[in-house]
Amino acid sequence: MLLSQDLTGNLTSSAGYSWRGYNAFHAGFTYKGLYPVFDFKINYGGKNSIIERPNDNTQTLSQHNRTQIDVRSYIPFSFTRSRWITGFVPQIKLSYHNSYLYSSITADFQYGMWEMGYSVQAYRYLKMSVRDLQPRLGIVVQSAYKHWPWNAQFGYIYYMYGRAYLPGVAPHHSLRMSGAWQKQEIKEYRFGTWLSFPRGYYNHLPTEKLSIETIDYSLPICYPDWNWSFLVYLKRLTGNLFCDLAQNQYRYVENVTKQVRWRHEKLCSMGIDLLADVHLMQITFPINMGIRTVYVPETREIQPSLLLSVAFN
């Protein structure tokens, strides 16, 4: 991926390529010179999707390269004073992708899906020191609504989210508690969740009503300050203990009676992250990488996975 920024820092742009079994191209830019902030992204490559083709439908469709466009605009109001960082961010987002969507009402396919999303976020937390992993004290609240105004097959998704930060038992330790609630109105299709299921579960599980509570305790382990030539600089090792709880509800049709019933699920997971903050080849952007181990009591499974993130700001 290529990144660029103008001298004032008001305009940033990116362009990249990836291989996902097919050629995929990505590009975007963000302009912060005037309010509201404007953000544009486009992804191109692969065949566009055909959503829910009936078995008895033999209609020939001309598939094109998949194109997804996201346009976002927001105003980052800031009321920061002294030690407290305070802000309020209203946002609107428009997305389009050129999939085929089947409608049982018209018994035909509709080309292209348009999605509108609106959100507001408010936050207030203490400024962090260099060694802090999370704010020592603070709160974040957010509410969002998403719908498909030109695709009658979908309903809407609405969610509310809150997160609180509290100090840990030692310096630079942090306790983070969060809770979220989501409701989806279903018409012809059930859409994917906007929230993440507990760690260790897949986000493509069906859901109509979902509530989630999470607890994370983050702590620094050591500061090796070690480098191997110009290739790797290891700055810090950290750990994170977590526990996730969720209640999920959705409707389903019984195979025998064909009656519609509600299914209630209780989901739980817990685990640990071991992470390292590193710089590779003297690149300025820090890389956070490590291992996550999740235990799911429902299935008694232990699931290891790799974590990787890059901070570009």
Residue map of PLM features:
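Outer-membrane beta-barrel initiation region
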Residues: M1-T30, Y35, D39, I105, ...
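Gram-negative (and chloroplast) outer-membrane scaffold detector with strong preference
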Residues: T60-P76, G87, T214-S218
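Transmembrane beta-strands of outer-membrane beta-barrel pores
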Residues: D6, Y17-G21, G33-Y35, I42-N48, ...
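C-terminal outer-membrane beta-barrel translocator/porin domains of Gram-negative envelope proteins
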Residues: F40-K47, R53-N55, Q59, T106-C243, ...
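Outer-membrane beta-barrel "beta-signal"
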Residues: V120, I215, G271-L274, I302-N313
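Solvent-exposed loop/turn segments connecting transmembrane beta-strands
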Residues: M1, Q5-G9, S14-A27, K32, ...
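Repeated loop/turn-to-beta-strand initiation elements of outer-membrane beta-barrel proteins
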Residues: T8-S13, F25, L34-F40, F77-I85, ...
